[in-house]
């Protein structure tokens, strides 16, 4: 999470400015689409692709980072390739008296090596956890030791992931 933003994603003082879609022009959008497809594209190739000078392209990418549009560049690791062949989405509901412990739950659960993503929700469930495990026993152990054993957790529901496909750019 970027410096200056809270765990819930609410902007706080010192966080990147509030960027509106209208602040992005066609060139910014083309840069973002190209980086979404290949975040490792060399700046010179990116500049050529969008039709601007490399120095201009570099400045625009830096600006998009500074204002918080580009949050980072990540390595997409295949969990199965590193021995974590089973993935699941786990819906988690906290006890109604545990609402004040949401931040501590998030901070704790993010430290678990099986947790790939944490989604804080509105609706019937409080969270969805995207987890990776070696096998069903490893997944069961994660749920029992990290969720069922937590007195603040009211319930969980686990759905196995058969295939994970990356979605389109949000543009």
From Swiss-Prot:
A GO BP annotation: response to amino acid
Domain HTH asnC-type: 24-85
Induction (record text): Negatively autoregulated.
Subunit note: Homodimer in the absence of L-alanine. Homooctamer in the presence of L-alanine. Homotetramers in the presence of L-cysteine.
SUPFAM superfamilies: Dimeric alpha+beta barrel (SSF54909), Winged helix' DNA-binding domain (SSF46785)
Protein name, per record: HTH-type transcriptional regulator AldR
Role of this protein: Transcriptional regulator that might play a role under hypoxic conditions. Regulates the expression of ald, which encodes L-alanine dehydrogenase. Serves as both an activator for ald expression in the presence of L-alanine and a repressor in the absence of L-alanine. Acts by binding directly to the upstream region of the ald gene. Four AldR-binding sites (O2, O1, O4 and O3) were identified upstream of the ald gene.
Domain of life: Bacteria
Entry comment, domain topic: Contains an N-terminal DNA-binding domain, followed by a rather long linker and a C-terminal effector-binding domain, which is also involved in oligomeric interactions.
UniProt note: phenotype after gene disruption: Deletion of the gene does not affect the growth rate under aerobic conditions. The ald gene is constitutively expressed in the mutant regardless of the presence or absence of L-alanine. Induction of ald expression by exogenous L-alanine is abolished.
DNA-binding region extent: 43-62
Transmembrane segments: none
Inhibition and activation profile: In the presence of alanine, AldR changes its quaternary structure from a homodimer to an octamer with an open-ring conformation. The binding affinity of AldR for the ald control region is increased significantly by L-alanine. In vitro, L-cysteine also increases the binding affinity of AldR for the target DNA.
GO MF term (any one): sequence-specific DNA binding
Organism this protein belongs to: Mycolicibacterium smegmatis (strain ATCC 700084 / mc(2)155)
PANTHER family tied to this protein: LEUCINE-RESPONSIVE REGULATORY PROTEIN, POSSIBLE TRANSCRIPTIONAL REGULATORY PROTEIN (PROBABLY LRP_ASNC-FAMILY)
Keywords: Activator, DNA-binding, Repressor, Transcription, Transcription regulation
Region annotation (Disordered) ranges: 1-21
GO cellular component: cytosol
Biased composition annotated in UniProt, kind: Polar residues: 1-14
